[in-house]
Amino acid sequence: MTPLLIASDVNIFYGEKQAVCGVNLNVQRGTVNALIGPSGCGKTTFLRAINRMHDLTPGARVTGRITLDGEDIYGPRVDPVTMRRRVGMVFQKPNPFPTMSVFDNVVSGLRLAGIRDRDHLMEVAERSLRGAALWDEVKDRLKTPATGLSGGQQQRLCIARALAVEPEILLMDEPTSALDPASTARIEDLMTDLKKVTTIIIVTHNMHQAARVSDTTSFFLNGELVEHGPTEQLFTSPRDERTEAYVTGRFG
C-alpha cells in the first residue's frame, strides 16, 4: 500500500541552526502515528513542517521533500492555505476563537472557504461535533461562547473545528498535556475512532499514551529520527540501544 505521507531527507533550519536532520518517514492512511522523544528533540519541529507552519517563522527553512498523497506539499504551485486545509492541526492548549460561539468556531474554516449555506454549515457542524464526541454535550449551547466550555470540551471543540474541513491528516501536538485524566481518556478514545475517517500524527511526551493509542511510533533524539516501527515492537524490542534507553526511562 502506498503511504499517504512520505518524508524524504527532511532537514529543518532556524537561521544557521539545524533542528531536524535528514528525516525519512512513511505514514500509512488510517493510522495513528506517535512521535516521541525528550524535549528539544525535533519532534514538534518536524510535525509543524507537515502543514507548512514554518512558512510563518522568519528565518526558518525546510529542505528535502514531503509528499501528501503523491503531491509535494512544498511544491512551487502549492497554495499553503489550501494545504493547511488538507492537514489539520490541534495544539497543546485548547485555542477556541474567544469571540465566537461554539457553532461559529466549528464552521469558521468553511466560511473562510466561502461556504455560506446555513443548512450545510449546520450539517457539517453536527457531523464534526459528533466526530469529536462533543455533540451531546453542546447541542443546546451552539450559540453560546466557546470559552464557556471546560478545558476538555474546548480541546474537543478544536478537534471538531479541524474535522469540519475534512483533513486528510490531523496533526496533534501534545493535545492532552493541559487536560485532566478524565478529559485525556476521552480524547485518547476519540483518536481510535477518528482513524476511521482520517490519519493522525501525534506528538506526545507520555510514552504510556503513545503505547495506548498509536499504531506506529517514531523516536526522535537530537533532531534525528532514531527509530520508527510498529508501536508494540518499538516499546518491547527496540532495534536501537538509544531507543531502549529512552523507553525504559534511563534518560529523557
Swiss-Prot record:
Pfam families: ABC_tran (PF00005). SUPFAM superfamilies: P-loop containing nucleoside triphosphate hydrolases. It comes from the Bacteria. InterPro entries: AAA+_ATPase, ABC_transporter-like_ATP-bd, ABC_transporter-like_CS, P-loop_NTPase, PstB-like. It is found in: Cell membrane. The keyword Repeat does not apply. One of its GO terms (molecular function) is ATPase-coupled phosphate ion transmembrane transporter activity. Gene3D superfamilies: P-loop containing nucleotide triphosphate hydrolases (3.40.50.300). It catalyses: phosphate(out) + ATP + H2O = ADP + 2 phosphate(in) + H(+). The keyword Aminoacyl-tRNA synthetase does not apply. GO terms for cellular component: plasma membrane. The complex is composed of two ATP-binding proteins (PstB), two transmembrane proteins (PstC and PstA) and a solute-binding protein (PstS). Part of the ABC transporter complex PstSACB involved in phosphate import. Responsible for energy coupling to the transport system. Belongs to the ABC transporter superfamily. Phosphate importer (TC 3.A.1.7) family. This is Phosphate import ATP-binding protein PstB. It comes from Deinococcus geothermalis (strain DSM 11300 / CIP 105573 / AG-3a). The lineage of its organism: Bacteria, Thermotogati, Deinococcota, Deinococci, Deinococcales. The gene is pstB.
